[in-house]
Regions:
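N-terminal pre-Walker A segment at the start of P-loop NTPase domains
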Residues: 1-28
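Interdomain hinge/linker elements that couple catalytic modules in large macromolecular machines
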Residues: 2-11, 167-287
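Conserved lysine of the Walker
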Residues: 45
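Hydrophobic positions on the alpha1 helix immediately C-terminal to the Walker A/P-loop
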Residues: 48, 52
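Conserved catalytic segments around the Walker B and adjacent sensor/switch elements
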Residues: 56-71
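Short glycine-rich substrate-engagement loop in P-loop NTPases that contacts/grips substrate
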Residues: 67-99
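Structural recognition of the conserved hydrophobic beta-strand(s) that form the central parallel beta-sheet
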Residues: 104, 129-135, 156
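Short regulatory helix/loop adjacent to the ATP-binding pocket of P-loop NTPases
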Residues: 138-154, 166-171
Length: 287
C-alpha cells in the first residue's frame, strides 16, 4: 500500500515509548528541521511516527518507499517541495497542511533522491513538518550527494529499554518502580518482582514485537521464534545494502558477537570472527 492516512496498520504495543517526548520537543522547536529517525529494522520507528502523527497532529500522511517503487519517480523528477506536496496530496487524497499534517517518509534509504530532497523542505518549505525513517542509512549518510548535511535533525531509535519494557509488561510494577526515590530502600517483595522482570528483559530483549508477544502469550518459544526471524532479516539486509564483496565478512562479524561478549577480555578479538583473522581483514566490515 502506498500510503495510509489515519489507522495504524498493526498495533505493536499499546504503550508510550520514551522517544515520543523527543518527537514532541522536535515539533515545538522553532528551529526545527526535517527529522530523520535512524535505527535497525523492527525497533519501532514506524510505530513511533504513526503514533506521534495520530496523537499530536490533526492528520498524518504516510509513504513507504519500500512498498511502492512508483513513488520514487516523484523525487527523481522534482526538487521543488511545493510540487512534491501537490503530487503527494493527489496520491493520498488528502490536503497536506503546514503545521497541521505530519508527513512521514518510511524506508527512505530505498530512495536517495527523497533523502536529498529534505534539504529543500528545510530551505523552502520548513512550515511543513516532515519525518523520515530508514534502516541501514550508514551507506547513504557517507555519501554527501545523497545526504543533506546540516539540513536535517537526526534521532537514533533503539529497542525498548528496561523502563519501557516494564511499562508495557507490568504497569502496576512500573508505577512502583517510577516512584522509587534515590537511596530509598526497596521492600523485598518488590525487589524480587523487579529482579524477575529484569531477568525476563534479559531473555526477551527490547524489540517491540518480542515484547508484544510476551505481553499477549507469555510463551518463551514464541519469543524465540520471533528473535530467530529478526536475526534472519538482519543477515539478509547485509547483502542487500553492502554488496557481495563485504556481505560475507559483515555476516561473520555479526555471528561472532555472542562469542565476543562472552569473553572475559573486553577487547574485540578478530580470531573469534575467523581463525587467523586480522584487523585489516574485518575493520571495514565492523565499520
Amino acid at each position: 500500500m502506498l500510503y495510509s492516512y489515519h489507522p495504524l496498520e498493526r498495533t505493536v504495543i499499546a504503550t508510550k515509548r520514551n522517544a515520543i517526548q523527543d518527537l514532541i520537543n522536535w515539533k515545538n522547536d522553532e528551529e526545527r528541521k526535517p527529522l530523520v529517525l535512524k535505527g535497525a529494522r523492527q525497533v519501532g520507528k514506524t510505530w513511533l511516527m504513526k503514533e506521534f502523527g495520530k496523537n499530536h497532529y490533526k492528520s498524518f500522511v504516510y509513504f513507504n518507499f519500500d512498498e511502492e517503487d512508483e513513488l520514487k519517480s516523484i523525487f527523481e523528477v522534482n526538487k521543488n517541495p511545493q510540487r512534491i506536496l501537490e503530487l503527494l496530496s493527489l496520491i493520498c487524497g488528502e490536503k497536506i497542511l503546514p503545521r497541521e499534517t505530519l508527513i512521514i517518509f518510511d524506508e527512505i534509504q530505498e530512495c536517495p533522491e527523497a533523502l536529498n530532497t529534505l534539504k529543500y523542505f528545510k530551505e523552502k518549505a520548513n512550515e511543513y513538518h516532515v519525518i523520515a525513517a530508514g534502516s541501514l542509512l550508514g551507506t547513504l549518510l557517507a555519501k554527501p550527494k545523497s545526504y543533506p548535511v546540516g539540513m536535517v535533525n537526526l534521532l537514533d531509535i533503539y529497542p525498548m529499554n528496561f523502563e519501557e519494557f516494564l511499562k508495557a509488561t507490568d504497569p502496576v510494577l512500573y508505577a512502583y518502580y517510577d516512584s522509587i526515590q534515590k537511596e530509598q530502600q526497596i521492600e523485598e517483595i518488590f525487589h524480587n518482582r523487579l529482579l524477575e522482570a529484569y531477568n525476563n528483559y534479559l531473555i526477551i530483549g527490547g524489540m517491540p514485537e518480542c515484547v508484544a508477544s510476551w505481553v499477549n502469550h507469555k510463551d518463551p518459544a514464541r519469543v524465540a521464534q520471533i528473535q530467530r526471524e529478526l536475526v534472519e532479516v538482519y543477515e539478509n539486509d547485509f547483502s542487500k545494502h553492502n554488496g557481495k564483496v563485504n556481505s560475507g565478512r559483515i555476516l561473520m562479524v555479526f555471528r561472532s558477537i555472542v562469542a565476543q561478549l562472552a569473553k572475559p577480555n573486553e577487547k574485540f578479538m578478530y580470531g573469534a570472527v575467523r581463525e587467523g583473522g586480522r584487523a585489516r581483514d574485518f575493520e571495514e566490515a565492523i565499520e
